[in-house]
Regions:
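Nucleotide phosphate-binding/pyrophosphate-handling subdomain across enzymes
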Residues: 1-54
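Structural beta-sheet core signal
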Residues: 27-29, 59, 115
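Short, active-site-adjacent cap segments at secondary-structure transitions
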Residues: 35, 121-123
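Short secondary-structure boundary/capping segments
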Residues: 44, 130-132
Length: 144
């Protein structure tokens, strides 16, 4: 499966990255606490509610960062508040396990995977994959 990692963590960057998705995609989302949480989540919730491009979402919590993670319970509550509790979702606090779950979902559905919401989540998962697969980070990392 094609997996895309994005450090988008505010409304504008999340909206931009979601707009660039051209194939059905499972979303793995986790972020650090911020003052305007709901404003930051507006683009994600809007896309999940009206766009069939995102058939499933997995919520997780970054392990590192300056601020504490937004809990998976809080993310699920926001989803319910937006009236989109019908979108198939899964919650897993451990981002490593969440990554495996989201990857399996994407593989089973034959769709892509987008990891988004926090630079710390991206860093946690890059470290995990490098260690899990015995990779050299500098050999596999590409920038665009």
């Amino acid at each position: 499966i094609t997996t895309r990692l994005s450090a988008a963590h505010n409304a504008e960057s999340i909206e931009s990255d979601l707009y660039e998705v051209t194939r059905p995609t499972v979303v793995l989302f986790g972020m650090s606490k911020k003052a305007e949480l709901r404003k930051s989540l507006d683009p994600l919730m809007a896309e999940l509610s009206m766009d069939r491009m995102f058939p499933k979402v997995v919520f997780t919590e970054p392990m590192s960062g300056r601020n504490p993670a937004v809990t998976v319970e809080e993310l699920s509550e926001v989803m319910e508040d937006y009236g989109i509790g019908y979108v198939p979702s899964k919650v897993e606090k451990d981002p490593h396990k969440a990554f495996e779950i989201a990857g399996s979902m994407a593989k089973d559905l034959g769709v892509d995977l987008l990891v988004i919401g926090s630079v710390y989540l991206v860093g946690d998962l890059l470290n995990y994959v490098v260690e899990r697969d015995g990779l050299d980070l500098w050999e596999v990392l590409t920038a665009h």
